[in-house]
């Protein structure tokens, strides 16, 4: 059935009103950037803080930090990255290279009327933020990154090849490589169940998926949500991924080896902006081989010479910004306030 344009616009307006009610009066708009239409959530006036989400997430992952930073005199800006939520999702896998994604954010920064912004990243958003700082440090005042430490380019081995050699084909990153396979596995499960399983995963062990058996291959398991996560939160994430599917997010992983090839000219480049890094001690990313030694024994500081603060939160999993929202907001504010 085709509905009149005026009806569709009215319904979109009502949806935005409902989103505003559930997320603390955050405003929503669309921006044309780098050839795509990007959805942006924002709140507040003052120096701009760009929040970059990960997988399987949305701008909504930063809902607490947006409200907190806006109340403290900052303009909090959180887009849905390309392929996620209400932002366009180009069909071509090649449209999700790190250069495309960083290009989107450079255009977004310029659309804000800012020469430089503070940047906060988590998960894939952290990877994007590291690369933004490598490619365009002139756009970043300071960076707060979470969960995923900087990964200097290995000049001799592609990243997916390295991970497959350690973990085999069942590591989630390896399992996501073949177009269509992960989509078929995810389609067998309820979307809300998938979101719950990802957000509540707190094992320091790597996330492994047997072929055809993502999270055991069944949605029958009853999951009790932690205090920091509500059914409304799950439903918001699930409603968006039910509309878009997960292909956009998978395509980030499918470009890992291609990003390695394209970024050869930046081999050995340091991250030269002020940095604070935060991670939970139960975060699987923190327990990847050699990561702890890299973070704590000089390698991280060598590659990120302006690393100022390193915070390891005890008893905290991967989704640190949602699990400890107030503490994380305080850490962000304290750090960026030094440079405001």
Task: Place the predicted regions along the sequence by residue.
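Flexible "cap/lid" subdomain of the alpha/beta-hydrolase fold that forms the substrate-access gate
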Residues: 23-27, 37-38, 47-48, 72, ...
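Conserved HGGG/HGGXW glycine-rich cap/lid loop of the alpha/beta-hydrolase fold
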Residues: 36-88
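Signature tryptophan residues that serve as conserved aromatic anchors
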Residues: 55, 59-62, 124, 130, ...
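Catalytic histidine-centered segment of alpha/beta-hydrolase-like enzymes
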Residues: 316-324, 329
């Amino acid at each position: 059935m085709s509905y009149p344009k005026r009806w569709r616009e009215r319904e979109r307006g009502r949806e935005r009103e409902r989103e505003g009610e559930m997320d603390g009066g955050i405003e929503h708009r669309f921006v044309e950037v780098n050839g795509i239409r990007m959805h942006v959530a924002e709140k507040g006036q003052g120096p701009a803080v760009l929040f970059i989400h990960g997988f399987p997430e949305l701008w909504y992952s930063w809902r607490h930090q947006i409200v907190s930073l806006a109340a403290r005199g900052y303009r909090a800006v959180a887009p849905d990255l390309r392929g996620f939520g209400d932002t366009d999702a180009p069909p071509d896998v090649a449209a999700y290279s790190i250069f495309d994604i960083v290009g989107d954010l450079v255009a977004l920064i310029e659309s804000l009327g800012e020469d430089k912004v503070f940047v906060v990243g988590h998960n894939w958003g952290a990877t994007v933020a590291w690369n933004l700082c490598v490619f365009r440090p002139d756009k970043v005042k300071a960076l707060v990154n979470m969960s995923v430490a900087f990964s200097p380019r290995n000049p001799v081995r592609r990243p997916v090849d390295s991970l497959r050699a350690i973990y085999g084909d069942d590591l989630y990153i390896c399992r996501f490589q073949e177009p269509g396979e992960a989509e078929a596995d995810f389609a067998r499960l309820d979307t809300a169940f998938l979101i719950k399983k990802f957000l509540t995963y707190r094992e320091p062990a790597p996330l492994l998926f047997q072929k055809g058996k993502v999270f055991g291959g069944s949605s029958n398991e009853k999951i009790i949500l932690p205090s920091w996560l509500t059914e409304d939160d799950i439903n918001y994430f699930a409603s968006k991924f039910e509309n878009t599917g997960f292909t956009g997010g998978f395509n980030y992983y499918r470009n890992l080896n291609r990003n390695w090839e394209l970024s050869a000219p930046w081999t050995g480049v340091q991250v030269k902006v002020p940095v604070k890094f935060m991670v939970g001690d139960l975060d699987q990313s923190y327990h990847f081989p050699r990561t702890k030694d890299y973070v704590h024994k000089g390698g991280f500081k060598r590659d990120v010479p302006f690393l100022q603060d390193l915070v390891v939160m005890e008893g905290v999993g991967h989704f640190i910004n949602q699990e400890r929202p107030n503490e994380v907001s305080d850490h962000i504010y304290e750090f960026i306030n030094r440079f405001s």
